[in-house]
Regions:
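Acidic/His-rich, divalent-metal-binding segments that scaffold phosphate/diphosphate chemistry
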Residues: 83-218, 225-236
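Short, charged helix-to-loop "capping" segments that act as catalytic/coupling loops
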Residues: 63, 170-181, 299-308
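Alpha-helical scaffolding flanking metal-ion-dependent phosphate/phosphodiester catalytic sites
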Residues: 162, 183-198, 209-311, 320
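Non-catalytic interface/linker regions that flank or bridge core catalytic/transmembrane domains
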Residues: 1-149, 153-154
Length: 320
C-alpha cells in the first residue's frame, strides 16, 4: 500500500483503547483492528463484550482498536451510558424508586449532552422497565419521589418523575399490560428530549418570555419527535414526545388536537408533566405542595384541559 493511501485510510479512523470497553456491555458502533494499514472489522454494531474476550484481546497484544471518526460521538455516549450507576434489586420499592430517580436524572443529563444513539434508547428502555416493575410491586412508592432538586437540575429530574407518576396513574386506571406500561414509562422519560435544543437561559428564565422566545420553547415537541425519528421506538412513546402539550380542549400545541384525537397514554403523561412542574421549584415559580398542585389542577385545568379519570387516578396514587 502506498504511503498516501495509507495516510488517507488512517485519517478516517481513530484509536479506541480496549480498556474503554466494559464487561457485559454492547457497543453500537463498529470496531476495527489494523493489520499493516488494512482496517479489518473486528466487531460490528450490537456486539456484546465478555470479560473473557477483553482479557484475550489484551493477551494478544491488542490494547487498542480503531473506530471510524464519524462514530466518535457514539463512543462518547457509550462510555457515558456504561458508567451510569446500577440499581440494587434488593432494595424496597420506596428505596428503589429513589435510586431509579437518581439514575434517570443522570441518564437525562447524558441524553441532553450527547448524541441520541441506539445505546441511549436501549438504556432508556431498561430504565423504563425497572421503573415499571418497581411501581407494579408497590404503587405507593411514588410518594417517595424526591423534592430535593432545585431548578438548576429540574430538567434532569423532571423526566423520570413524570415517567413514574405516569405509570402509577396508568396502574390506578386499571391498565395491566406490562409492555404497555413500559411504553408509557419510556414516553415519560423521553417526553422533553426536544429541550436539548432549547437554550438553557430560556428554560431557566425567571421573567416572562417574549413571543420569539416562547416560539422556541413551544418548538420542543416537534424537535424531540424529529430527534427520535431514527430510534427503534413504538408508536406510543413517539406520540407522547410529540403531543404531551396538547390539551383536551384543543388549545394545546403543536397540533391543536382535542380529546377525540389524543391517546389516553398521552393524556396521562400530560397530567404527570403538569403535576411535577407545579410541585417543583422553578426559576419563575415557587414549588407547590402536592395538595396545592392537585387543587390548582382541579379548579383551573380539570374542566377543559385534563382527563378527569387520570386526575382521579393521580389523587388515588397520592392518597394511598
Amino acid at each position: 500500500m502506498n504511503e498516501s493511501k495509507s495516510a488517507n485510510i488512517s485519517s478516517n479512523f481513530d484509536f479506541f483503547s480496549v480498556d474503554r470497553l466494559i464487561d457485559n456491555s454492547v457497543t453500537d458502533f463498529d470496531l476495527f483492528i489494523n493489520l499493516r494499514d488494512h482496517f479489518i472489522l473486528y466487531s460490528g454494531s450490537g456486539y456484546k463484550w465478555s470479560r473473557e474476550e477483553l482479557t484475550h484481546l489484551f493477551h494478544a497484544g491488542h490494547t487498542s482498536l480503531f473506530v471510524r471518526k464519524q462514530d466518535m460521538s457514539k463512543t462518547m455516549m457509550y462510555e457515558a451510558i456504561a458508567k451510569l450507576p446500577t440499581v440494587r434489586q434488593d432494595l424496597s420499592p420506596s428505596e428503589r424508586i429513589r435510586a431509579i430517580e437518581d439514575l434517570g436524572a443522570k441518564f437525562t443529563q447524558c441524553l441532553f449532552e450527547g448524541e441520541i444513539t441506539e445505546a441511549c434508547t436501549d438504556k432508556a428502555k431498561l430504565i423504563a422497565q425497572e421503573l415499571t416493575d418497581c411501581i407494579l410491586e408497590d404503587r405507593s412508592c411514588v410518594l417517595n419521589l424526591g423534592d430535593l432538586a432545585g431548578h438548576d437540575f429540574y430538567t434532569f429530574y423532571h423526566s423520570i418523575r413524570v415517567s413514574a407518576y405516569s405509570v402509577a396513574v396508568a396502574v390506578s386506571l386499571g391498565l395491566s399490560d406490562v409492555q404497555l406500561l413500559r411504553e408509557i414509562a419510556l414516553g415519560g422519560i423521553l417526553h422533553d428530549v426536544g429541550k436539548r435544543d432549547v437554550p438553557v437561559a430560556l428554560l431557566n428564565k425567571s421573567g416572562p418570555l417574549s413571543e420569539p422566545e416562547w416560539s422556541i420553547v413551544r418548538s420542543h415537541p416537534r424537535v424531540g419527535h424529529a430527534n427520535i425519528a431514527q430510534s427503534i421506538l413504538s408508536h406510543i412513546p413517539r406520540e407522547i414526545v410529540l403531543h404531551h402539550h396538547e390539551r383536551r380542549s384543543g388549545l394545546g400545541y403543536p397540533d391543536g388536537l382535542d380529546h377525540r384525537s389524543l391517546l389516553t397514554e398521552v393524556q396521562i403523561v400530560t397530567l404527570a408533566d403538569i403535576f411535577d412542574a407545579l410541585t417543583s421549584a422553578r426559576s419563575y415559580q415557587k414549588r407547590r405542595t402536592r395538595f396545592e398542585a392537585l387543587d390548582f389542577i382541579k379548579h383551573k385545568l380539570l374542566k377543559d384541559d385534563i382527563c378527569p379519570n387520570a386526575f382521579r387516578a393521580l389523587v388515588s396514587c397520592l392518597t394511598a
